[in-house]
Amino acid sequence: MKFSDIISKLEVTNHSLTQNPNNDPEITGMAAIDEATSANLSYIEGAKFASFIAQTNASALILPQNEAMQAQAQARGIVWMTTPEPRLLFAKAIALFYQPYTPTPEIHPTAVIHPTAKIGNDVYIGPHVVIQPGVEIGNGVIIHPNVVIYPYVKIGDRSILHANCTIEERSQIGADCIIHSGAVIGGEGFGFVPTRTGWYKMEQSGYVVLEDRVDIGCNTTIDRPSVGETRVGYDTKIDNLVQIAHGCQIGAGCAIAAQTGMAGGVKLGKRVILAGQVGIANQAKMGDGSTASAQTGILHDVKPGEVVSGTPAIPHKIYLKIGAIYSRLPEMYQAFRQLQRQSDKESKR
């Protein structure tokens, strides 16, 4: 594909062809800036990575709106396009070269489908899929091999269920959702009542709702509650190996990284970001636009827009100051001991 074809399809107006229309190389693929070879398109996200322009073997670059970087690329004969959001444009460009596998609609003969299930149009149901009573599947849904769908589940249009995921009873999956392999949606919440003779099992009669455009990573689990619902909001993206307990309410547009765990009844507002291995205690709330850095332990509510770190969670700026002091503790301790010894000597005079 010619570079000119790429900028046309991406609808980019600021690019090197306006200055040198004859330099229009063939681009055959995409690559990271430090791995790119001739005929590759790559990107640089900001001025602090400008040194890569002198080192890369890429034939084309997506650059920020920085004239110095554009001139540097031009001097090396690298064609470029510019945008306020290079990473976003790079993501859009990938789709010009790669499309994920999409099977042709069919129902495989080994699939087991209960006669009361309702299947929409243009649906793919792969080998050894099990669909139980009362299930409703929308149009254009893709269900890869070995998926198990429990009774009375609803799956919205164009959603994709990858191999070996499980959707348990009465779960509601919205449109354009993607659920990756090994995920379990709607499993029983951890509900046991202590008695004198042991634990009494509380039946989990609730259900899980995934709103439209939710992505669920591999081996993530989202539990249903004893009553009511566990809900994941519109356009929220959840990584691999995340545990979301019974009754959690997750707002729209959140991003949750791997190995995060939420206890029961946690509430996240809109656009909350959780980095890897965050733990959130029972019933804690995080306000709209708040962020928790990696390995944060959240025991209490977090205000809207607040960034927290550490265990127990504290404001991120304070956490950084504590970290700076922590690395100096040995020297500070030695200075303290010296002062203490001097004080002891003076007190003995």
Curated annotation (Swiss-Prot):
- Please tell me one Gene Ontology term that the record gives under cellular component: carboxysome
- Entry's InterPro entries? Hexapep, LpxD, Trimer_LpxA-like_sf, UDP_GlcNAc_AcTrfase_non-rep
Q: Which reaction does it catalyse?
A: a UDP-3-O-[(3R)-3-hydroxyacyl]-alpha-D-glucosamine + a (3R)-hydroxyacyl-[ACP] = a UDP-2-N,3-O-bis[(3R)-3-hydroxyacyl]-alpha-D-glucosamine + holo-[ACP] + H(+)
Enumerate the GO terms in the molecular function aspect. N-acyltransferase activity; structural constituent of carboxysome shell
Biological process, per Gene Ontology: lipid A biosynthetic process
Q: In which pathway does it act?
A: Bacterial outer membrane biogenesis; LPS lipid A biosynthesis
Q: Name one Pfam family in it.
A: LpxD
Q: Which UniProt keywords apply?
A: Acyltransferase, Lipid A biosynthesis, Lipid biosynthesis, Lipid metabolism, Repeat, Transferase
> What EC number(s) are associated with this protein in UniProt?
2.3.1.191
**What SUPFAM superfamilies has UniProt attached to this entry?**
Trimeric LpxA-like enzymes
* Family per similarity comment: Belongs to the transferase hexapeptide repeat family. LpxD subfamily.
- Subunit composition and interactions: Homotrimer.
| Name of the protein described by the UniProt record | UDP-3-O-acylglucosamine N-acyltransferase
- Please report the organism this UniProt entry assigns to the protein: Nostoc sp. (strain PCC 7120 / SAG 25.82 / UTEX 2576)
Gene behind the chain: lpxD
